[in-house]
């Protein structure tokens, strides 16, 4: 039952007048651009990459995840973003299309495990000169803290061996 149905039934049962409640005026909220959360480790990672590539002709290939928000000021560290797992392969294509550019790819740990590994395999196989930055916060943060192969916990909550990203790369 809805709140309104229960309210009307109670007023009728108690033989009370059931006046319609006054509408609540919702205040207009100020504009707030999307930003990385306070304390997010990706802020420092993006800043470090920005400092390290200063003066280079760099392209920053992003991916789908909360770190996509690295595209906004003051970081401005995501030039491309297409779909989950595309950042690594887009960096490869851009390196071939524009050899003078330094291409960095940013992928979260969850994206790395779910769709990034084939791109890494291709980059190694093709001997492509790209930099892959895996932003590892040990969870699937954007969609609710789900485990992934790097967490050591299965989707059913069972403990298992965590896969180590650095060892895999």
What label would you give each PLM region?
Residues 1-20:
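Terminal amphipathic helices with adjacent charged low-complexity linkers/tails
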Residues 6, 37, 60-62, 123, ...:
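Generic structural hydrophobic/aromatic packing signal, biased to beta-strands
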Residues 71-169:
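Thiamine diphosphate
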């Amino acid at each position: 039952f809805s709140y309104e149905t229960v309210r009307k039934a109670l007023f009728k049962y108690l033989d009370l007048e059931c006046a319609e409640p006054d509408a609540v005026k919702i205040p207009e909220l100020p504009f707030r651009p999307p930003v990385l959360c306070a304390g997010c480790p990706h802020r420092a990672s993006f800043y470090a990459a920005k400092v390290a590539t200063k003066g280079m002709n760099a392209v920053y290939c992003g991916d789908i995840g909360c770190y996509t928000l690295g595209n906004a000021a003051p970081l401005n560290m995501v030039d491309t973003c297409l779909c989950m797992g595309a950042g690594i392969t887009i960096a490869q294509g851009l390196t071939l299309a524009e050899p003078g550019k330094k291409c960095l790819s940013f992928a979260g740990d969850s994206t790395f495990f779910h769709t990034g590994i084939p791109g890494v395999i291709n980059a190694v196989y093709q001997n492509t000169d790209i930099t892959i930055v895996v932003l590892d916060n040990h969870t699937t943060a954007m969609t609710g803290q789900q485990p992934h192969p790097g967490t050591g916990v299965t989707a059913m909550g069972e403990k298992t061996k965590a896969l180590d990203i650095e060892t895999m790369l």
